[in-house]
Amino acid sequence: MSILSFLLGEKKKSASVAKERLQLIIAHERVGGRPPADYLPALQKELVAVISKYVRISNDDIRVSLERQDDLEVLEVKIEIPQA
């Protein structure tokens, strides 16, 4: 963030905020070593809310999953967007 944007009070775009949240969640899971996926329903609900601002979708149109294999974690988000 630049000093100018800080002084002018520009808000971050919702995409960058969502990206930061996802990075924090994944980093937290890697450090904690807890069983995953307790946050996935909340994440799915929040993604639907954000995407619904721009495109009409329902809860059934988005699927979120987290898979772990050895040291690799994959967060998969599938979104069905209707034809325009």
Curated annotation (Swiss-Prot):
Pfam families documented for this protein: MinE
Similarity comment: Belongs to the MinE family.
Domain of life: Bacteria
GO term, biological process aspect, one: cell division
Protein role: Prevents the cell division inhibition by proteins MinC and MinD at internal division sites while permitting inhibition at polar sites. This ensures cell division at the proper site by restricting the formation of a division septum at the midpoint of the long axis of the cell.
NCBIfam families per record: minE, PRK00296.1, PRK13989.1
Gene: minE
HAMAP family associated with the record: MinE (MF_00262)
Protein name: Cell division topological specificity factor
Keyword field contains Cell cycle: yes
